[in-house]
Amino acid sequence: MVLGMLVVLALSAPADAAYGPDLQSASVATSADETAIRKVIGDYAKAIETKDLELFKTVKPNLTLEEEKRARSAFASIQSQVVKITFLSIDMKEHQAVVKVTRRDTINGSIPGAFPQTFTMNKGRTGWVIAEIGR
């Protein structure tokens, strides 16, 4: 009976509640900058999930032509993708931040596994943006 209720609750939860980025850390109160950084990373995940190249360019405005080409190719080859981001650390120094996460994608219904990602971010006049994405 309990197992049945858990299955129903899991299935009735909104998709972004189950797979969206962990925008708030339960253990530490976040600063306005940390909250903004987490939102940008969340928008990055949303851009991938929704195949929204314009949103991708908003969070990573220095996107190169090669990166754009790879993104278009990936978006075209994947039917569905859910991106789960788990924040490991946010190291801020003035107008730069290094954000370490674990990312787990569900691609076309399959979970190929989790992998680390490191984002180098810059804060400009319009707020935080992704400068580099690495592993």
Spans of features found by a protein language model:
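Exposed beta-sheet edge and beta->alpha loop/turn motif
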Residues: 92-135
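Short solvent-exposed beta->alpha transition segments
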Residues: 20, 28-98
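Intrinsically disordered, low-complexity regions enriched in Ser/Pro/Gly/Gln/His and often acidic
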Residues: 12-13, 37, 120-122
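Juxtamembrane and targeting peptides
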Residues: 1-31, 98
